[in-house]
From Swiss-Prot:
Binds 1 Mo-molybdopterin (Mo-MPT) cofactor per subunit. The keyword Signal applies. Residues 1-45 form the signal peptide. This is Protein-methionine-sulfoxide reductase catalytic subunit MsrP. It is found in: Periplasm. The lineage of its organism: Bacteria, Pseudomonadati, Pseudomonadota, Alphaproteobacteria, Caulobacterales. Predicted to be exported by the Tat system. The position of the signal peptide cleavage has not been experimentally proven. GO terms for cellular component: periplasmic space.
Length: 306
């Protein structure tokens, strides 16, 4: 795998040698899982790092990121995903990409990792519950994957689906949600360069409790939009059904952009608690990514289309 510099990066955007070596652990970890194409020579290629999209805020500790999670397929408590995901098998793994496109295909996770240019991006993550983290993800832009299947003019939205494995995901035995978990984006949101398909964090492979082996990261939206353990991506003409919106449409809108001016019916969204900090901080519109994404919603009433 040739890990190339992203076209918008300069020499100053690429990490120094110590971080370059640190990021080799991702490919080494992939190789240890038996992923084809992740040899030592590939690991030496390193990863690119885009300062243009990454926040300079201090990342949340890896311990907090991997032990304080919402992943209802493994249970509803924050500690359940880490405690109950040990039996989950993220390899082998394939993802079906279909719908309104000219070249639908099924692709293995090894090909997704081996044939896409991986980047580390440090993103803020804001949960709809009023807490937040800063997470150093490793992944590739979703737009690159979608472009490979050649979307047609009928592709107005993108629908995502999580794997259904009750034997490995004990939370799916309960009717907490209408399983499998489903999410969706508008096509322009999906094609936005900020939208990431994550395969790792902190320079290592993605842990089970964080959505292994492949999850969506949309940093200007509330965290539940970041669907985990994805097995299907469909380009569709109509707005897709999404799990939390079906359960409680007044509380969880399809768009779910981070908006401190639009409260959840049961709590304020004006402030948030950063995990690892004591004091609450003000929540930023679009989670601080407004300069890149606000234009997509300029003509919309964000209180109506929440």
């Amino acid at each position: 795998m040739l890990i190339r510099h992203a076209p918008d990066l300069t020499d100053n955007d690429v990490t120094d040698h110590s971080l370059y070596l640190k990021r080799r652990t991702l490919m080494a970890g992939v190789a240890g899982l038996g992923v084809a194409g992740a040899s030592a020579s590939h690991a030496q290629a390193g990863l690119t790092f885009s300062r243009g999209f990454s926040t300079t805020e201090k990342p949340t500790s890896k311990e907090d990121i991997t032990t304080y999670n919402n992943f209802y397929e493994f249970g509803v408590d924050k500690s359940d995903p880490a405690e109950n995901s040990g039996k989950f098998k993220p390899r082998p793994w394939t993802v079906r990409i279909d719908g309104a496109c000219e070249a639908p295909r099924t692709v293995g996770i090894e090909d997704l990792i081996g044939k896409n240019k991986l980047e580390e991006r440090i993103y803020r993550m804001r949960c709809v519950e009023g807490w937040s983290m800063v997470i150093p993800w490793v992944g590739f832009p979703l737009k690159d994957l979608l472009a490979s299947v050649k979307p047609t003019s009928k592709a107005k939205f993108v629908a995502f689906e999580t794997v259904m494995r009750p034997s490995e995901m004990p939370g799916q035995a309960w009717n907490t949600l209408d399983w499998p978990y489903r999410e969706g984006l508008r096509i322009d949101e999906a094609m936005h360069p900020l939208t990431l398909m994550a395969v790792g964090l902190y320079g290592d492979v993605l842990p089970n409790q964080n959505g292994a082996p492949l999850r969506l990261v949309v940093p200007w939206k509330y965290g539940f939009k970041g669907i985990k353990s994805i097995v299907r991506i469909s380009l569709v003409e109509k707005q897709p059904v999404t799990s939390w919106n079906v359960l409680a449409p007044r509380e969880y809108g399809f768009y779910s952009n981070v908006n401190p001016a639009v409260d959840h019916p049961r709590w304020s969204q004006a402030t948030e608690r950063r995990i690892g900090e004591f004091r609450r901080r003000e929540t930023l519109a679009f989670n601080g990514y407004g300069e890149w994404v606000a234009d997509m919603y300029r003509s919309m009433d964000l209180k109506r289309f929440y």
